[in-house]
Amino acid sequence: MGLGDKIRNTAEKASGKVKEATGKATDNEKLEAEGKTDQFKGNAKNTVENAKDTLRGN
């Protein structure tokens, strides 16, 4: 996994946490759900990239 991918995935997760917290604070269920989705996507992308690295022997 390239460093750029790690940074993008981590940024997506962080952005998701901010969205989720903002959604909770403002009682905005849609924003909260978007935040959870962004976090899930960031985690999923990291999992896929880590699996690729493992298969490549990195």
Curated annotation (Swiss-Prot):
InterPro entries, per database record: CsbD, YjbJ_sf
Domain of life from the UniProt record: Bacteria
Parts of the chain that traverse the membrane: none
Spans annotated as Disordered: 1-58
Coiled coil: none
SUPFAM superfamilies: Hypothetical protein YjbJ (SSF69047)
Bias (Basic and acidic residues): 1-39
Family: Belongs to the UPF0337 (CsbD) family.
Name by which UniProt lists this protein: UPF0337 protein CE1672
Organism: Corynebacterium efficiens (strain DSM 44549 / YS-314 / AJ 12310 / JCM 11189 / NBRC 100395)
Classification of source organism: Bacteria, Bacillati, Actinomycetota, Actinomycetes, Mycobacteriales
